[in-house]
Swiss-Prot record:
Signal peptide: none annotated. This is Zinc transport protein ZntB. Belongs to the CorA metal ion transporter (MIT) (TC 1.A.35) family. It is a multi-pass membrane protein. The chain crosses the membrane at residues 274-294, 301-321. The keyword Transport applies. It is found in: Cell inner membrane. The lineage of its organism: Bacteria, Pseudomonadati, Pseudomonadota, Gammaproteobacteria, Enterobacterales. Residues 1-273, 322-327 are cytoplasmic.
């Protein structure tokens, strides 16, 4: 493939444009730099910026069917070979487990052995790890190594997020053993996050597996082996997600059971109180009718005797309930 001049990928509002030096480091791209397989270029763009959008729409370095994909709407992870290059869409975890499950950020990239063009709208936090390694001179030396390092960083962030969700589920299970109900919506958010992760990480694992099996010219056997290891690691994370989803279903049933038992207990208590006080309520209502005068109304000890009778009646009903093992 012919070399590319640095001026051809000069985008004023690019997030950054770097030239890999072949020794694990980078340097800012200059107009007179020569871009080839030994010194590939990484151009990172925000496709909502006007200059970046114009460059994506007009540059002859990209196939026509790649332009819309790099600046289009978010889609599920996928990989497509297009001539000498490859179009890849990946998802990255941004944010924490306390956020709503919309923190999966899309990153699209087109690459061949000379040029890496990556686009995003929101910042991809996982790229910070790769950028840091490159700035310290310990990063990838070629396009294949760059792709492996990026996929490894994405998987690290996904695995860490899955582990955080798993820890939350363990804490929730421990609380349920102590009859502690989580706040309303907590379990639903947790389950939604797991489902969203499952939705995007499953095809992303397939992307990694395909990259490991494809004979891409800019990926060595070592790159393919490392990519397969990344796919296997993400597959284990997906197994963990499936187990967590099943556990949240069990916890939802357990929470419903605990709440039903609590409601039954309260209803039972109110029923017992009604049974205890129903006879006394009947007598007080009967005497309160006051037709033809209240019996014993003219006797000075009548009210006291009536109160004693009520106490005896309540005690008798309580004793009966206790012997019947209702109390």
């Amino acid at each position: 493939m012919e070399a590319i001049k640095g001026s051809e990928v000069n985008v004023p509002d690019a997030v950054f444009a770097w030239l890999l030096d072949g020794r694990g480091g980078v340097k800012p791209l200059e107009d007179d730099d020569v871009i080839d397989s030994q010194h590939p270029c990484w151009l990172h763009l925000n496709y909502t910026h006007p200059d970046s959008a114009r460059w994506l729409a007009s540059t002859p370095l990209l196939p026509n069917n790649v332009r819309d994909a790099l600046a289009g709407e978010s889609s599920r992870p996928r990989v497509s070979r297009m001539g000498e290059g490859t179009l890849i869409t990946l998802r990255c975890i941004n944010g924490s487990t306390d956020e709503r499950p919309d923190q999966l950020v899309a990153m699209r990239l087109y690459m061949d052995e000379r040029l890496i063009v990556s686009t995003r709208q929101r910042k991809v936090l996982a790229l910070d790890d790769v950028v840091s390694d490159l700035q310290e001179g310990a990063g990838p030396t070629d396009c294949g190594g760059w792709l492996v390092d990026v996929c490894d960083a994405l998987t690290d962030h996904a695995s860490e997020f899955i582990e955080q969700l798993h820890d939350k589920i363990i804490d929730l299970e421990d609380n349920l053993l102590d009859q502690q109900i989580p706040p309303r919506g907590f379990l639903a958010l947790l389950r939604k996050q797991l489902i969203v992760m499952r939705r995007y990480m499953a095809p992303q694992r397939d992307v990694y597996a395909r990259l490991a099996s494809e004979r891409l010219p800019w990926m060595s056997d070592d790159h393919r082996r490392r990519m397969q290891d990344i796919a296997d690691r993400l597959g284990r994370g997906l197994d963990e997600i499936d187990a967590c989803i099943a556990r949240t279903g069990i916890m939802a049933d357990e929470i419903a059971l605990v709440m039903q038992e609590s409601l039954t207990r309260r209803t039972y208590t109110m029923s017992l109180m009604a049974m205890v006080f129903l006879p006394s309520t009947f007598l007080t209502g009967l005497f309160g009718v006051n037709l033809g005068g209240i019996p014993g109304g003219g006797w000075r000890f009548g009210f006291s005797l009536f109160c004693i009778l009520l106490v005896v009646l309540i005690a008798g009903v309580t004793l009966w309930l206790h012997r019947s093992k209702w109390l």
